[in-house]
Amino acid sequence: MAELKNDRYLRALLKQPVDVTPVWMMRQAGRYLPEYRATRAQAGDFMSLCKNAELACEVTLQPLRRYELDAAILFSDILTIPDAMGLGLYFEAGEGPRFERKADTLEAIKALPIPDPEDELGYVMRAVSTIRRELKGEVPLIGFSGSPWTLATYMVEGGSSKAFEKIKRMMYSEPMALHLLLDKLADSVILYLNAQIANGAQSVMIFDSWGGALSHSAYREFSLRYMQKIVDGLTREADGRKVPVTLFTKGGGLWLESMAETGCDALGLDWTVDIADARRRVGHKVALQGNMDPSMLYAPIPRIEEEVEQILAGFGEGTGHVFNLGHGIHQHVDPEHAGAFIKAVHEKSRKYHK
């Protein structure tokens, strides 16, 4: 593998000194870029794009050609694991992801296999190794998975949900069935992320998109407990370097201390959290990633620059901050505004790293 030329993202996650604050964007390979839309059209549909290693590599690299980003993230989807378990993932126009079959009974959950990442999910591993090779050491590659709780919401509901009625009914009336599902998912995620690391991912992130829908005690029992199991099971060193792990619960500002106790290296913050407060609470234990409101990219460029300065000042001096949005970039954002955001982070952060 080529030697890494820009490692400031990995260094910041491990709280080692950096020259400027590193920056990348969730969904940086996405529909806001015309070149992405062209490649997706060429692929035919979203999952065909994910399953073609060359095209997945192409869209991963597209934002790096435009912007001075400090990391690349694997182009894939969080629902690859449930799809590989045989639930039949498909996408409805305007409806988002759906499954042909649900995992909404104890019998259905018991029947679920744990997928082999090199077999049923081999297309993801081919994408990881292709991207890592084509990056030529320019920046590190981030691998990722959904959290067990978040994956389970789609599997029990049969797709996206606003109220989570079916899974919450299971959680409160059949908790053992849900724990069995979450345990299988945690085992699957460990295998999946370790395979990504073996194929070239230099850092991994767990997206707990729907953890914020849980009550205080339910979050610990049904989400955090299983992310803890994953952190404990991950390969933490590869290519002679530590492989940092980031946990991100959207709406998880209440639980930063508990998340920091898992042994992860960094916490993702959404835009509802004050980063200065987050650093006071957990900055001695973990690095922080975030946390500009993605909608700020609709603002005039001077306003974006002002917001970047405010977040940098909120975090303050020293390392341990990876700048990002508080969630994925929106599809209608002007690519020039994204570029101005990335440039502002590098230019305005230098004074905090003397």
Curated annotation (Swiss-Prot):
A single MF term (Gene Ontology): uroporphyrinogen decarboxylase activity
Catalysed reactions listed for this entry: uroporphyrinogen III + 4 H(+) = coproporphyrinogen III + 4 CO2
Stretches of the chain forming a coiled coil according to its record: none
Pfam families: URO-D
Sequence positions that bind substrate: 27-31, 77, 154, 209, 327
One Gene Ontology term, aspect cellular component: cytosol
Any GO BP: protoporphyrinogen IX biosynthetic process from glutamate
InterPro entries, A to Z: UROD/MetE-like_sf, Uroporphyrinogen_deCO2ase_HemE, Uroporphyrinogen_deCOase
Keyword Ion transport: no
Compartments where located: Cytoplasm
Pathway assigned to this chain's UniProt record: Porphyrin-containing compound metabolism; protoporphyrin-IX biosynthesis; coproporphyrinogen-III from 5-aminolevulinate: step 4/4
NCBIfam families referenced in this protein's UniProt entry, alphabetically: hemE
Protein name: Uroporphyrinogen decarboxylase
Organism of this sequence: Shewanella amazonensis (strain ATCC BAA-1098 / SB2B)
Lineage, highest ranks first: Bacteria, Pseudomonadati, Pseudomonadota, Gammaproteobacteria, Alteromonadales
